[in-house]
Amino acid sequence: EPFVLCHAAGFFIAIVAEQLHGDDPPAAGPGPDASVAIIIPARHEPKQVIESTLLTCLNMDYRNRSVYLLDDSSIESYKQEACELAEAYGVRLFTWDGNRGAKAGLINDVLAGLQEKYVAIFDADQNPMPMFLDKVLPFLEGDPKLAFVQTPQFYSNTDVSRVAKISHAQQAVFFEYVCEGKSSREAMFCCGTNVVLRRSALEDIGGFDEGSVTEDVATSLKLHLRQWRSLYYNKAYTFGMAPEDLGAYFTQQNRWAMGSIQLFRKLMGIFFTNFRALKIHQWLEYLLTSTYYFVGWAYL
């Protein structure tokens, strides 16, 4: 019961924060002309899925950008398809045969050779709208201490199965209410896609955290520990694909659960050795995030 009450209180706080701050857009800077690297990590994705994402990224209104397709596939047919797509659409292809740090290691290797000021990341099944960068970049240009701007992740294939429909509903609660609360309490974390990051902020912490299966949240913690700020912009400019069967859904949830456990262990180490590294409300939000998947143990 204490576990449930704590998380219920956390959700209530998020709702209140959303009501207080949700209608007040943050101040944005002038229209940007900074360079942006659009990164699309892919591993064993169907050709048509990657192609759709490439097309939507290339169709963005913002022109000062370069598109990078990062292929981490181990099967030759997928590698060949990625090569064909990169050649057909004139995007830069980065192939990787390493196994260091999974997605984080792949992105870090690419980051080492980038010169662009900002990095936009979209999973291979996420389709951004043409105005995405025009809407998001002004916030980063207006605040030099803003490390990243996270936007919602909503699914467009909810009619495929009940699993997809339920996954969408689960995500909707998180992105509509919880994220607003976390952002207002200076603890919004990167969700790994539909996000634009400042490259210098990533360089400041040595790139994405390669020691966690949820590199996005672990990296966000590192940024907040270094006093970088984050922002959640609650406008849906990207639509993706939900898990369509129970196998895919449980694989997704298992990865998030494992990442939460890893985050909790790291938090405890910092909490008892360097409590002043975060503000009280940041600690509370990160503890709620890292213990969410403990709900099963709470009912044992």
Regions found by a protein language model. Give the residues of each.
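A conserved hydrophobic helix/loop-capping motif in glycosyltransferases and polysaccharide synthases
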Residues: 37-45, 60, 139
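N-terminal membrane-anchoring/stem segments of glycan-assembly enzymes
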Residues: 1-32, 86, 285-300
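A conserved acidic beta->alpha catalytic loop
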Residues: 71-82, 98-99
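Long helical/loop segments within the catalytic core of UDP-sugar-dependent glycosyltransferases
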Residues: 87, 94-118, 130-213, 224-225, ...
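Catalytic donor-sugar/metal-binding loop of nucleotide-sugar-dependent glycosyltransferases
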Residues: 211, 220-239
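Short, acidic, metal-binding catalytic loop of nucleotide-sugar glycosyltransferases
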Residues: 55-64
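Cell-envelope/extracellular polymer assembly enzymes that use nucleotide-activated donors
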Residues: 34-37, 66, 218
